[in-house]
Amino acid sequence: MEKATLNSIQKSVWEGQIPLKIVLAPSESRTYDQTDPYLISYPRISYLPSLLPRLKAFFSSSLIDPTASQPHDGWFSFEGVPLKWHYPVGLLYDLYAGAEPATKSSETEALDDEQLPWRLVVHFGDWPDAELVRLDAQGTVMHDAFINSVKEADFVRNGTAKGIMTLSKDDSSGLWKAVQDVDLPSFQRIMNILLPPNPHQPLRNLPVRLFLPLPPKPDSNSDSPFLKVVQSPIPPTISTTPSQLQRQMAQSTLSSSGVSGSSPGAAQPQPQTQTIGTALHSILPNLFPSRRTPVIAKPVLHGAQVPMSAPVEEVVRAAAYGDGWVYIVIRMMG
């Protein structure tokens, strides 16, 4: 795919937003559930904690005790489930509120209308220590979590985190600031140091994580859905399968009749581009028995179904989140 096309896709990803309707937890409100909501259209690549200072100011007059908490004491929930603050809001929405189908019908459009704006609850007390790590007033915890995720992606790509470790202090902090400010040009400048344009630096593996929302465990006391995260080495290319090699040899044998002058057995294994379909078939064969067509489940990224034929490396370069990871949500079909 042309670099201009990849850049265009990345621009669209960074421009993607989700309408949010954030309400104050009734137990913390002077008026219980009658507090006015906070409405905002929020970038998919952003993180919910960045909203906490303005939410604390907005709901301050409605809090039973506004002096009892600070902005960094805030956390979010959806239908009673605490939301992991280190996940981008776009991933959280795809996990918990559904994904946009490849083709819309009147029925799915009506469903979208019910899901948007996405209704979240903000809390400034009763921090769920069992589910979430606490934030700090300086934002250091959030920054460090982001940079650690960037390091992990760098290690997966190159077998070492030397790239992110050798960034200047300004570039390291600038990467996080670019994501916070949704500043794509600044982000691209720094990311091009970590992920040089192909083919200057061949990649070892591709940073992709698969998320499988599952029903609550039978032995669990919670009604919250269980979330399984799958990560496996995904190289940019794969070896030719025996059946594919046989087809190549058969074609070579036919052409040896004089059409091309090739001799029987001349076909050699050639690396093939790793696609979303081949990767999913390899990692989750029961859910993806076909490499070409979603049959049982479908991959969702940034609210849209990902084509099975899409090369994984191109998806990483064009549609990764700010930390360099491609977070694909697996949704059952039917």
Swiss-Prot record:
GO annotation terms (biological process): aggrephagy; autophagosome assembly; cellular response to nitrogen starvation; mitophagy; piecemeal microautophagy of the nucleus; protein transport
PANTHER family assigned to the protein according to its UniProt record, in alphabetical order:
AUTOPHAGY PROTEIN 5
Instruction: Please provide an example of a Pfam family that matches this protein in its UniProt record.
Output: ATG5_HBR
Q: Which UniProt keywords apply?
A: Autophagy, Isopeptide bond, Membrane, Protein transport, Transport, Ubl conjugation
Where do we see the Glycyl lysine isopeptide (Lys-Gly) (interchain with G-Cter in ATG12) cross-link in this protein? 151
Tell me a GO cellular component. Answer: phagophore assembly site membrane
- Tell me where it resides: Preautophagosomal structure membrane
Quote the protein name from its UniProt record. Autophagy protein 5
Q: Region annotation Disordered: residue ranges?
A: 237-272
Carries keyword Ubl conjugation?
Answer: yes
Which family is this sequence assigned to? Belongs to the ATG5 family.
Q: How does it assemble?
A: Conjugated with atg12.
Domain of life (superkingdom): Eukaryota
Annotated membrane topology: Peripheral membrane protein
| Originating gene | atg5
> What function does the entry list?
Involved in cytoplasm to vacuole transport (Cvt) and autophagic vesicle formation. Autophagy is essential for maintenance of amino acid levels and protein synthesis under nitrogen starvation. Required for selective autophagic degradation of the nucleus (nucleophagy). Also required for mitophagy, which eliminates defective or superfluous mitochondria in order to fulfill cellular energy requirements and prevent excess ROS production.
Location (main, coarse): membrane
- Tell me the InterPro entries matching this sequence: Atg5 (IPR007239), ATG5_HBR (IPR048940), Atg5_HR (IPR042526), ATG5_UblA (IPR048939), Atg5_UblA_dom_sf (IPR042527), ATG5_UblB (IPR048318)
Q: How is it modified after translation?
A: Conjugated to atg12; which is essential for autophagy.
Native species: Emericella nidulans (strain FGSC A4 / ATCC 38163 / CBS 112.46 / NRRL 194 / M139)
Low complexity bias spans: 252-272
